[in-house]
Structures are given as structure tokens and as C-alpha cells.
Amino acid sequence: MQVIIISGLSGSGKSIALKALEDSGYYCVDNLPASLLVILINHLQTQHHSHVAVAIDMRSGDSITVLPWQFKMIDKSIRTEFIFLDTRTDTLIQRFSETRRRHPLSDKNITLEEAIQHEREVLATVSDLGHHIDTSSLRPNALRAFIRDFISDSRDPSQLTLMFQSFGYKHGIPLDADLVFDIRCLPNPFYDPHLKELTGHDLEVIRFMEAQPNAAKMLGDIGSFLDTWLPVYMQDNRAYLTVAIGCTGGQHRSVYFAEKLALHFRDAARVLVRHRGLAEYNQYYARR
């Protein structure tokens, strides 16, 4: 039996993620009180459900605070994954404004921003239970793609998920980054008129980067650092590790580095790649 638990801030994309799992054949339960998690799983196991997804959030009230304990009480024979969706406050305010939806914690006595902050503080107790995903700049189809890749990975579920994420500093550091490497000191293909409109996926940019001695040295140093410390992270029983590579715009250098590193570590962990700065590539995909 496989169980995927989804939690996160209101407006972060939980409904989209749950619908993607339902479309993939999962038996889905939305807005479950956290205190009923183990009871539900045990019941569904007796009903021979093999794939189950459950969404638990602040709509269930203060019972969300017991989720860490409930999570630990799940039978160890059941493959269990936890996904926490996070989003920047300014993005959440914009989403609620555009959809004209009411935040579940808002009332006439507090502002929307205050409601979001309160929810963030309460959910801090559960945000580190598993895969922490920043959906601030993630489009719905990209979130669906991440879910599809996540459930299609047949590797050992206890194996650490290693995510390489390229980004542009002009849009801020990703919320879900565990390690951040700044490569803005390297020559920028953006200033070459022939490369300006291309990306780190294009052969011309790849050749440009490969011709830079410092780029090769920095790539090797980052790879060596991860070669040394990745086993230590694994021994710490971490479920995931997000490595963010940042350049100015997230179009050329960081994309090249993320792809190279993902290729290097594809046999060492469950590897995912995301290019936050590329609209057409703003999605997660598995590197196999």
C-alpha cells in the first residue's frame, strides 16, 4: 500500500496536486482531520486500497498539530510519502485577490496577510515532515508534472530525493532551497548577442559554458562537495534535499549547472530537476 499525504498553505496548490493523484488512480480524501489519519489508513488497508492520497490542512482546525505524531504512527510496512506545498506571502495574496476566494482563517478582525502569517506559523510544525515544494512561480501544469514524476519513480521510497533547481537571483532565492550555490561570478552568455535569447539547454550555450575554465572548476567543486556530504544527508534519514543553483536571470548558467549536476547524481538518488526561471521549462521532471 502506498499513501501520499499532502499539506501546505491555503492557495499553494493542494487541490491541484490531489486532483492529479486522483487522475492517476489514487483513492483521494480531502480535508481529513489530522487526528483521523491512522484510523483512515488502517480502514482503507482492510478494504485493499493500494494507492491512497490524503489532504490535511488548516481547514481541519487545530488538530493539524497532531499530524507529526500521526505520521510516525503509520505502519512501517506502508510506503508513506509527505508533500508540503509552500508559497510566498505576496503570491498568495495575489492568488486570493484574483480568485476572490476567502482565506479559511480570515475574518473581519484580521487582514488576509495576517491570516496567511498565522497559518504559516501553525503549519511550521508539519512543514519539514517530507518533500517541501515552493509553488510560488509554479504553474498548475508544472505542479501536475511534478506529481506525475513523483509517483512514477519506482526507486526505493526510502532513498533520498535530490532536487536540482536553477533560479534567477532577481526573482529571489527559492523558499524550499536547502543548499544554495551562487554562480553569478561566471561569464554570462546573456551578453553575447548570439546567445542572449537561448537557454542553458541549447548546444551553443553549453559549448560557451564548457569553454570557461572557472565554470568547469566550480562545477567540479560543487560536485565534489555533494559527493562528500550527500551520504551524510542520507544517513540523517532525510527524505529530500533541494540544491538551488542561482545566476542573474535563471536562463543560462544555472540551467546548465543544474542539468550537469542532475546527470552526475542520477544513480545516487531519486533526482528531480526544476528550472524556475524558464517559463517554457518551469516544471519538475525526473532525471533518469
From Swiss-Prot:
ATP binds at residues 8-15. The keyword GTP-binding applies. Disulfide bonds: none annotated. InterPro entries: P-loop_NTPase, RapZ-like, RapZ-like_N, RapZ_C. Keywords: ATP-binding, GTP-binding, Nucleotide-binding. GO terms for molecular function: ATP binding; GTP binding. GTP binds at residues 57-60. The keyword Protein biosynthesis does not apply. Displays ATPase and GTPase activities. Belongs to the RapZ-like family. This is Nucleotide-binding protein Neut_1559. It comes from Nitrosomonas eutropha (strain DSM 101675 / C91 / Nm57). The lineage of its organism: Bacteria, Pseudomonadati, Pseudomonadota, Betaproteobacteria, Nitrosomonadales.
